[in-house]
């Protein structure tokens, strides 16, 4: 059972609204206060009964909280932290849910130097966003990565781990640097590819003035599903994780050039071996938990 009695959730998109629902479902004794900068989102949160209190004042939301869960875009973390800082209790724990860790941790530490911060990243989601997109089961059996540093109190880490486990998550610990490299490979690069692929095909369609995408089969739809994700959110992620993403992107481009060379030179042996190795890796992935991005 979580030790937290009052949780404030800042940002009510997919992750924030799901955390609110999950907290109410699995931690019914916890008071949940909610804040989002959007009046429309706040009104939807009230209509959906996502929390005990939905406020238009971020300081009111966090004033009594012993856990503040930050579910805002990574480039909004600093603004949010500065806005809520004067109202925070001394012993409150701050936990972000961002997809980038190194830069976000620095931003939070700069703005909240006297508070305990336990960075986290639930590896759960869909291409949908907003308070209506969330659901209480989102985190069930999905990894939640915690990236504390040497100065993070062990008790605070345990409290945050217990909370995520209470609402369904599976805890993993790693350094912030390793997290950003891993996510550049497994999440951020796939989003780059999805946005670029559907953008390229759409461009072909517009230029040729002939229908193309109406003939897309399952492979195209699967490969581009995450391009339906919120663009501004992913703009922030790409820019904030550029130090980890750019080398990964360079590696991908180099490998793509090798494939092009093999196709141009009719090197079937290279293609077959490459496809076999890739198939083997994908089939092995199916035996583990299939994580939504």
From Swiss-Prot:
Q: Which reaction does it catalyse?
A: L-arogenate + NAD(+) = L-tyrosine + CO2 + NADH; prephenate + NAD(+) = 3-(4-hydroxyphenyl)pyruvate + CO2 + NADH
Record-annotated Prephenate/arogenate dehydrogenase domain positions: 5-293
UniProt cross-references to Pfam families, sorted A to Z: PDH_C, PDH_N
**Residues annotated to bind NAD(+):** 6-30
Q: Does the keyword ATP-binding apply?
A: no
> Which pathway?
Amino-acid biosynthesis; L-tyrosine biosynthesis; (4-hydroxyphenyl)pyruvate from prephenate (NAD(+) route): step 1/1; Amino-acid biosynthesis; L-tyrosine biosynthesis; L-tyrosine from L-arogenate (NAD(+) route): step 1/1
Subunit text? Homodimer.
Q: What is its EC number?
A: 1.3.1.43, 1.3.1.12
Its annotated function is as follows: Can function as either prephenate dehydrogenase or as arogenate dehydrogenase in the biosynthesis of L-tyrosine. Catalyzes two analogous reactions: converts prephenate to 4-hydroxyphenylpyruvate and transforms L-arogenate to L-tyrosine. Is not able to utilize NADP(+) instead of NAD(+) as cosubstrate.
The signal peptide, as residue positions, is none
Family named by the database record = Belongs to the prephenate/arogenate dehydrogenase family.
Q: GO molecular function of the protein, one example? A: cyclohexadienyl dehydrogenase activity
What is the name listed in the Swiss-Prot or TrEMBL entry for this protein?
Cyclohexadienyl dehydrogenase
């Amino acid at each position: 059972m979580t030790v937290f009695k009052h949780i404030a959730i800042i940002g009510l998109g997919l992750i924030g609204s799901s955390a609110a629902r999950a907290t109410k479902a699995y931690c019914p004794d916890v008071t949940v206060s909610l804040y989002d900068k959007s009046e429309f989102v706040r009104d939807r949160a009230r209509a959906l009964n996502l929390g005990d209190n939905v406020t238009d004042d971020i300081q009111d939301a966090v004033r009594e909280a012993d856990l503040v869960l930050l579910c805002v875009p990574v480039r909004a973390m600093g603004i949010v932290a500065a806005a809520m800082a004067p109202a925070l209790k001394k012993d409150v724990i701050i936990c972000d849910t961002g997809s980038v860790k190194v830069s976000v941790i620095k931003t939070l530490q700069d703005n909240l130097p006297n508070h305990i911060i336990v960075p986290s990243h639930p590896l759960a989601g869909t291409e949908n966003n907003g308070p209506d997109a969330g659901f209480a089961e989102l985190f069930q059996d999905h990894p939640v990565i915690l990236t504390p540093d040497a100065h993070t109190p062990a008790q605070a880490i345990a409290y945050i781990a217990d909370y995520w486990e209470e609402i369904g998550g599976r805890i993993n610990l790693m350094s912030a640097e390793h997290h950003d490299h891993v996510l550049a490979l497994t999440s951020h690069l796939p989003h780059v590819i999805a946005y670029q692929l559907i953008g390229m095909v759409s461009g072909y369609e517009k230029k040729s003035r002939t229908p193309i995408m109406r003939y897309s089969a399952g492979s195209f739809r699967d490969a581009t599903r995450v391009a339906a994700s919120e663009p501004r959110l992913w703009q922030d992620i790409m820019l904030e994780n550029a130090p980890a993403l750019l080398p990964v992107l360079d590696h991908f481009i180099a490998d793509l050039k090798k494939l092009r060379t093999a196709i141009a030179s009719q090197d079937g042996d290279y293609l077959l071996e490459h496809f076999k190795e890739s198939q083997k890796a994908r089939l092995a992935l199916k035996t583990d938990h299939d994580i939504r991005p």
